[in-house]
Amino acid sequence: MKNIKVITGVIATLGIFSALLLVTGILFYSAVSSDRLNFQNASALSYQQQELGGSFQTLIETRVTINRVAIRMLKNQRDPASLDAMNTLLTNAGASLNEAEKHFNNYVNSEAIAGKDPALDAQAEASFKQMYDVLQQSIHYLKADNYAAYGNLDAQKAQDDMEQVYDQWLSQNAQLIKLASDQNQSSFTQMQWTLGIILLIVLIVLAFIWLGLQRVLLRPLQRIMAHIQTIADGDLTHEIEAEGRSEMGQLAAGLKTMQQSLIRTVSAVRDNADSIYTGAGEISAGSSDLSSRTEQQASALEETAASMEQLTATVRQNTDNARQATGLAKTASETARKGGRVVDNVVSTMNDIAESSEKIVDITSVIDGIAFQTNILALNAAVEAARAGEQGRGFAVVAGEVRTLASRSAQAAKEIKVLIENSVSRIDTGSTQVREAGETMKEIVNAVTRVTDIMGEIASASDEQSKGIEQVAQAVSEMDSVTQQNASLVEESAAAAAALEDQANELRQAVAAFRIQKQPRREASPTTLSKGLTPQPAAEQANWESF
């Protein structure tokens, strides 16, 4: 039994049930076919009875209508209203007669039914035709106002014959319906016995199938379910026995293989969970340390950014002062240039004065020469006056006066010459000094120009320095922002590392729920922090100072 496969038992069971189902289907089809035939016959008999009865009933109603017309004719009702009523009744009688003929034709054209007496059908047709002809002639005679001919017709005999035949036909029809009902009852009883026998066979087969399922499927499946529940409880120490080549044996073998794989997986997961837990703890510690140092770096960057802002303000102020100094230097240079031009004008004027003084000296020399010659002439005149005696005394007086004037003129000319020479000497000295002052002013102008250029270069350099410091400040601000973001990321990383540590701990606890055979446990190798996460305060401080 252990080597019997479930699929073989299922196929055998399906074959048995298919055979039983086939037999049941054949019997059921036979019973249904018989019932269907009986039902068709009963339906056809009912239809024929309805149509034949309808035709006979319509004929009787038609005769009643005709009798009403005949009664009115007997009463000699000849007024127009009565005549109209009789004509209407005769018309209705004709329509009823046509309807009766229609019902009878439906009966004649209906499906033939086995077991019926053809002679009885012929009698029914003859009685109908007889009654139909009598009623048709009655309508004709009454319309022709031939009451005598109408009275000679024996409608009652025709109706009696028709009713007699109809009663016989109804009796035959009832027998056929009863026969069909009896056949249906017999078929039903036979089907009941057949179904009972088949049900008994099915119960016996089900009992054998149940016993087979107990041994082949249910008991092995219960043992497998017990092993599965044991595995679900975390106990992997129970060994699973796999026997036979059936599906349950294959399932047990697969479950045993799964248990061995699960044992290896749980062992590996347990060891790796320990390693992950250790590494996660170290990562969490490193992330916390990195977060702290990142916060310190962010604080230092904030202070640096503040210092850079102050330095930027100072350099900007120096730039403004340098620009103002450049403007003042330009003003001083322009003033020095103007002073140089004034000194040049003074030098030119002093040169002109020197030239005029030299001309005055020349004129004084001429005056001195004239005075000398006048003195000589006065001396000669005095000599001549002395020679003249009394006559030349007045001339001598004049000559003496002239001589005195000439002497005074010569003396004055000498004094003027001395003064002019002193003036010329001083003018020369002043011209030299003014010339030297002009050279000095030129040197001052050149120096002020150089100072102006240097101040311009200083202002330009200060401006460039201010821009550079602003860029550095912006870079420091961006670094501060990035450091803040890094600090947030490091905090998130630390939180993730802590969460990983918690999850690793939960994984260890989850794996600890499994019980396996004692095996040599592999020690969890602690993971070392990478150099990027190793704290290096000295290096960081040195780099920060360099920055």
From Swiss-Prot:
Top-level taxon of origin: Bacteria
Record flagged with keyword Glycoprotein: no
Region (Disordered): 317-336, 518-547
GO terms under biological process: chemotaxis; signal transduction
PTMs per UniProt: Methylation level is increased by citrate and decreased by phenol.
This protein's UniProt keywords: Cell inner membrane, Cell membrane, Chemotaxis, Membrane, Methylation, Transducer, Transmembrane, Transmembrane helix
GO CC, one annotated term: plasma membrane
Regions of this protein lying in the Cytoplasmic compartment: 1-5, 214-547
S-S bridge residues: none
Domain Methyl-accepting transducer: 272-501
Modified residues (Glutamate methyl ester (Glu)): E303, E492, E501
Residues covered by the HAMP domain: 215-267
Pfam families with a match to the protein in the record: HAMP, MCPsignal, TarH
Subcellular location field: Cell inner membrane
InterPro entries (UniProt xref): 4HB_MCP_dom_sf, Chemotax_Me-accpt_rcpt, Chemotax_Me-accpt_rcpt_Me-site, HAMP_dom, MCP_chemotaxis, MCPsignal_dom, Tar_rcpt_lig-bd
Cross-referenced SUPFAM superfamilies: Aspartate receptor, ligand-binding domain, Methyl-accepting chemotaxis protein (MCP) signaling domain
Keyword Magnesium attached: no
Chain ranges passing through the membrane: 6-29, 190-213
Modified residues (Glutamate methyl ester (Gln)): Q296, Q310
Family indicated by similarity: Belongs to the methyl-accepting chemotaxis (MCP) protein family.
Known function: Acts as a receptor for citrate and mediates taxis away from phenol. Also mediates an attractant response to metal-citrate complexes.
PANTHER family per UniProt: METHYL-ACCEPTING CHEMOTAXIS PROTEIN II, PROTEIN ICFG
Name of this chain's protein: Methyl-accepting chemotaxis citrate transducer
Originating species: Salmonella typhimurium (strain LT2 / SGSC1412 / ATCC 700720)
Organism phylogeny: Bacteria, Pseudomonadati, Pseudomonadota, Gammaproteobacteria, Enterobacterales
Gene: tcp
